[in-house]
Amino acid sequence: MKKINQYKLLAGICALSLFTACDFEELNTNPFEMTDEMGIRDGVAVGGAVTAMQRAVVTVGTQADDTDAINQYQVAYNLSADSWSGFFGQNNNWYSGSNNTTYYLQDNWVAATYTNSYTTLLSSWKKIKQESEKTETPEIFALAQILKISAWHKTLESFGPIPYTHAGEPALVIPFDSEQVAFNAMFTDLTAAIDILTVRAEQGATIVADYDAVYAGDTRKWVKYANSLMLRLAMRISYADETTAQKYARQALNHPFGVMTSKSDEAQMSTGAGMVFRNNIDWLANQYNECRMGSSMFSYLLGYQLSLIHISEPTRHLRIS
């Protein structure tokens, strides 16, 4: 009788083990959360990362972000390059006048420029790279490459050497590339991305349309944008390396799709990917009451009065006061 009871107990334990093994994953999966498999199937795994990269090229936010993205844009760009270029002037006197606009650089503002133009989008780029390799979707990684270069060329031009060719690798120390090496790598990466997206565009394909807040997945427009970016980089190095500059400028201009030539080609984020984005300059000018048109820009526009009409009120980018 004792042996019979032992066998029954053993059988019961085995049955319970089998039941537990069969139902463990199901019981421990949140029915209200997306699994990795579902994310890959629905495109969310890379789609969300694409949107995140787009929002990091030039920091932009929505109402849900409150004013965080606007503040990040202000200290990273508006109080430095935007003002130094003469496009904008400032109606505030931060740090008693000792700030970036007077060339007294604030370390935290400089750090914000590096973080927003380089660090922020690195994790999203790595995720897209990994997922596109798993799912064999090189066109999505091609888009990620274009977005990465859109942001990182600003870092390169602002800070000099940056980690580029080995960025994202699992190493304790990532080497910095010289400006020449980084620019050449960007041209190579852009060429590869353009080639991939050109094929998809000729097939009439769109990519991650629901998550693309710029062109809604229009591959032809992305190719034109990438060609324009290539032309811009070529012009940037024209005095340092005329031969390379001419090569890639011609390559961009001679591409069958060409470069951006009309307003419909404009790469801008106002609504898209199910979101409504805030205009940073509008907020800095009309909500913060701090950003104004720069005197240099105003002086240039005085030479053609109609320019003042088109650049001030209708777009609500800024007001002339």
Question: Could you describe each region identified by the protein language model?
Answer:
Residues 1-20:
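Sec-dependent bacterial lipoprotein signal peptides
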Residues 15, 20, 72, 97-98, ...:
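Preference for short coil/turn "hinge" residues that link or interrupt alpha-helices
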Residues 40-44, 90-308, 312, 316:
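Structured, solvent-exposed acidic/aromatic patches
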